[in-house]
UniProtKB/Swiss-Prot annotation:
<feature type="binding site">
    <location>
        <position position="52"/>
    </location>
    <ligand>
        <name>ATP</name>
    </ligand>
</feature>
<feature type="binding site">
    <location>
        <position position="165"/>
    </location>
    <ligand>
        <name>ATP</name>
    </ligand>
</feature>
<keyword id="KW-0547">Nucleotide-binding</keyword>
<dbReference type="GO" id="GO:0044210">
    <property type="term" value="P:'de novo' CTP biosynthetic process"/>
</dbReference>
<comment type="function">
    <text>Catalyzes the reversible phosphorylation of UMP to UDP.</text>
</comment>
<feature type="binding site">
    <location>
        <position position="71"/>
    </location>
    <ligand>
        <name>UMP</name>
    </ligand>
</feature>
<dbReference type="InterPro" id="IPR015963">
    <property type="entry name" value="Uridylate_kinase_bac"/>
</dbReference>
<feature type="binding site">
    <location>
        <begin position="9"/>
        <end position="12"/>
    </location>
    <ligand>
        <name>ATP</name>
    </ligand>
</feature>
<keyword id="KW-0665">Pyrimidine biosynthesis</keyword>
<dbReference type="Pfam" id="PF00696">
    <property type="entry name" value="AA_kinase"/>
</dbReference>
<keyword id="KW-0963">Cytoplasm</keyword>
<keyword id="KW-0418">Kinase</keyword>
<dbReference type="InterPro" id="IPR001048">
    <property type="entry name" value="Asp/Glu/Uridylate_kinase"/>
</dbReference>
<feature type="binding site">
    <location>
        <position position="168"/>
    </location>
    <ligand>
        <name>ATP</name>
    </ligand>
</feature>
<keyword id="KW-0067">ATP-binding</keyword>
<feature type="binding site">
    <location>
        <position position="159"/>
    </location>
    <ligand>
        <name>ATP</name>
    </ligand>
</feature>
<comment type="pathway">
    <text>Pyrimidine metabolism; CTP biosynthesis via de novo pathway; UDP from UMP (UMPK route): step 1/1.</text>
</comment>
Length: 234
């Protein structure tokens, strides 16, 4: 099954590559090239990008910042990533619009649902920055929210690992990978793939979640084509 309208969730860490901080232009270019192949097949693609490669609100809060303030700083970090991703996409010929939940009219469009959907219908990629515009909500929750709003058929969470495991595969050799699992299993077992609000939103709106490795070339195209390359939550 090939999906026709997809919400791709990119973590900020995915844009770091092997760097300890910031944005790796080579990784952005690689992601942009993969996305260009997907859009070239008449797939409508929206992207929500995180900001953890620059600033993470929870970490700032743990270090003594006011939580709401820290989250707003994190939202600004996601806008930096969104603009960088737009640049990479446009350099490979993909028409792209950035929409932000917090208005920044000099650098991006404000988030307007109908305008976003119109961009998708015209074959443009829409990158959502600024989270959902409110503190205390993760960019995973933003991805679930935007997916429901634009009627996406699936949320694709691109990560550093090749699926969902019962424990950290980088720390435990006997970690078990799930091919398919239910929303309820993720919630009940507190599997750390997305926060519970994001999972519940997808569950309530019957939006499946595919988790896969972003660093393997061509995986975005394979995921959109419905290939079993990671883990599917439904």
């Amino acid at each position: 099954m090939t999906y026709k309208r997809v919400l791709l969730k990119l973590s900020g860490e995915a844009l770091m590559g092997e760097k300890p901080y910031g944005i790796d232009p080579a990784i952005v270019q690689s992601i942009a090239e993969d996305v260009s192949k997907v859009v070239g097949n008449n797939i409508q693609l929206a992207i929500v990008v995180g900001g953890g490669n620059i600033f993470r609100g929870l970490k700032g809060s743990a270090d003594g910042m006011d939580r709401a303030t820290a989250d707003y700083v994190g939202m600004l970090a996601t806008v930096m990533n969104a603009i960088s991703l737009q640049d990479g996409l446009e350099r490979v010929g993909v028409a792209t619009r950035v929409q932000t939940a917090i208005e920044m009219q000099e650098i991006a469009e404000p988030y307007i649902r109908r305008r976003a959907m119109r961009h998708l219908e015209k074959g443009r990629v829409v990158v959502f920055g600024g989270g959902c515009g409110n503190p205390f909500f993760t960019t995973d929750t933003t991805a679930a929210l935007r997916a429901a709003e634009i009627n996406a058929e699936v949320v694709m969470k691109a990560t550093k690992v090749d699926g969902v495991y019962n424990c950290d595969p980088n720390k435990f050799q006997d970690a078990k990978k799930y091919t398919n699992l239910s929303y309820q299993q993720v919630l009940s077992d507190e599997i750390a793939v997305m926060d519970s609000t994001a999972i519940a939103l997808c569950k309530d709106n019957n939006i499946p979640i595919m988790v896969f490795d972003i660093f393997k070339k061509g995986n975005i195209s394979k995921a959109v084509a419905g290939e079993a390359i990671g883990s599917l939550i439904s």
